[in-house]
């Protein structure tokens, strides 16, 4: 049964054009071709990425945060309350009004005190500003290096300037070491992002992020073993071209450098729109949808690859909408937060703090919010 499924999965007619077999892609005469087995190394490399990330965040990002004066807002902790804690962990973090009244009777607190307890408890679970800065620093470093390395891999290739050459001789196209390592490192990084997504800072587009990571992993993997490598290198470099700008804008936002953050965000928005909504659909997708049909009839791999590209393009449109909405609010002076942010809740009243098990009032040292929203007065 398993052997039958294995044989069917690797059936040449699924992944290769007509009249071609996997035997045509075996190494010969000093020419090396991509193989599915090459991808096995990406899983241990992904674990290595997680280890490197841990030490990077500890010994590079944390000192950098201190250097840039990234500060936290002092948060009031919710006082111990077994009744409310049990509800919080088992039933929900935002009780409805009827549930608030029930919890009020069970805990002996007023409804206002119960609501305040849940606000504080939710804020306790929200990631710290330092955690956000560390993550942004790590992603910025990778995306910047990956973009530079990717451009170095493709800038001297003829298909970078003439996309019809992407399919010249396909699929009998040998690989070179720079393409191999570019692919393995990119795929390993996205595996590491998927492995760590549960513990990373969660945003409102959490589900979209998962879809993006999975689609990217599938696309990179398929484009490798089906030898769509030339197109794949173009797509990866194009994606990396704007990601490092977004992460750097986040870093400066968390540091309170408002002007720098806003200026970088504007550059990011322009680059994102040009690369994801112009170059990708009208050049790259045109290259992968139209040109192959001039060489061979459509087959399953052709439809599969372009379907995954379509999923990514839909995500790009969704994110472009959020970016443009943020840019409009920024221009009109109405921007209050990142459209994808998990905003920290503030205390609506200080009068009930003592009864709720209060303590000292919150003293904001430096209030870091998502992109383009900060309460600092620092102008750089």
Regions inferred by a protein language model and the residue ranges of each:
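Alpha-helical transmembrane segments and their membrane-interface exit regions
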Residues: 238-249
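Membrane-helix and juxtamembrane interface regions of eukaryotic multi-pass membrane proteins
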Residues: 1-230, 250-256, 260-272, 280-311, ...
């Amino acid at each position: 049964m398993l052997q039958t499924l294995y044989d069917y999965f690797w059936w040449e007619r699924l992944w290769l054009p007509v009249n071609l077999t996997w035997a045509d892609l075996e190494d010969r005469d000093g020419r090396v071709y991509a193989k599915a087995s090459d991808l096995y190394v990406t899983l241990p490399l992904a674990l290595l990425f997680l280890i490197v990330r841990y030490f990077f965040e500890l010994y590079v990002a944390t000192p950098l945060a201190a250097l840039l004066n990234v500060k936290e807002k002092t948060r009031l902790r919710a006082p111990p309350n077994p009744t409310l804690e049990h509800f919080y962990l088992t039933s929900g973090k935002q009780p409805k009004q009827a549930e608030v009244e029930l919890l009020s009777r069970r805990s002996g607190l007023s409804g206002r005190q119960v609501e305040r307890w849940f606000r504080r408890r939710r804020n306790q679970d929200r990631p710290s500003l330092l955690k956000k800065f560390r993550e942004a620093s790590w992603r910025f470093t990778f995306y910047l290096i990956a973009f530079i390395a990717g451009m170095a891999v493709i800038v001297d290739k003829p298909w970078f300037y003439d996309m019809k050459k992407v399919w010249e001789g396909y699929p009998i196209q040998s690989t070179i070491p720079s393409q191999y390592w570019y692919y393995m490192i990119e795929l390993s990084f996205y595996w590491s992002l998927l492995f760590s997504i549960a513990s990373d800072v969660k945003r409102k587009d959490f589900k979209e992020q998962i879809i993006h990571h999975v689609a990217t992993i599938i696309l990179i993997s398929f484009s490798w073993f089906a030898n769509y490598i030339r197109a794949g290198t173009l797509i990866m470099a194009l994606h990396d071209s704007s990601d490092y700008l977004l992460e750097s804008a986040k870093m400066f936002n968390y540091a309170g450098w408002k002007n720098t953050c806003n200026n970088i965000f504007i550059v990011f928005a322009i680059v994102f729109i040009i690369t994801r909504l112009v170059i990708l659909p009208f050049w790259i997708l045109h290259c992968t949808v139209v040109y192959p049909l001039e060489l061979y009839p459509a087959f399953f791999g052709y439809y599969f690859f372009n379907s995954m590209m379509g999923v990514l393009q839909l995500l790009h449109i969704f994110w472009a909408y959020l970016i443009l909405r943020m840019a409009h609010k920024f221009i009109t002076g109405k921007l209050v937060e990142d459209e994808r942010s998990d905003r920290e809740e503030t205390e609506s009243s200080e009068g009930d703090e003592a009864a709720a098990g209060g303590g000292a009032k919150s003293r904001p040292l430096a209030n870091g919010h998502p992109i383009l929203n900060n309460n600092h007065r620092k102008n750089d």
